[in-house]
């Protein structure tokens, strides 16, 4: 039986396990070993039985009609911004300027304020467009942020850190992708920023263990 993911619900199949993210309820659901009876292609679900389809609809994870949310599209992270920046000659590295300090402080305050809102309200609107390859200007502004970051009075888990950096980079005119991903056995959820195939705030080698479930 053909179904569609409900509005605000995202999913990924990892081996034989299906993981759902319900954005409105800020909750993950894992259905282990269901891969043989449940297929996923984009936002289209294929259930092998009417009973399974009805259970997914009753749980709010699936719907009998499609919605306008775009299907997940993203590149796997192949490069790490940190490594690229550290390979630059000292004369090529960017020292923070006043605009970097102002941008970072404003981003930190905005991210602290965002913590008071529900998870769904912290996310930008969904878009099928992906960020382009990291430009030299983006890398220079990221390099400046990495230099001043130890002095900022802000810290937190990956959601806060990636949101802070996203606010900072977008405030300086850059487009980035906010990747939300999961792994199983053991289950873990993680998020990071990416431009093209470059991870901006994490190590690409570490991120290959995660499977993207949502991109904003």
Give residue ranges: language-model regions.
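Long, low-complexity, charged/polar intrinsically disordered regions in eukaryotic proteins
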Residues: 1-16
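Acidic/polar residues at beta-strand termini and the immediately following turn/coil
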Residues: 14, 21-22
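Long, charge-rich, low-complexity alpha-helical segments
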Residues: 17, 25-112, 121-125, 172
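Short strand-coil-strand connectors
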Residues: 23-25, 196
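Secondary-structure boundary elements
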Residues: 87-157, 161-170, 194-195, 199-201, ...
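Short, well-structured beta-strand/strand-turn elements
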Residues: 172-185
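A short, glycine/Asx- and small/polar-enriched loop/turn
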Residues: 186-190
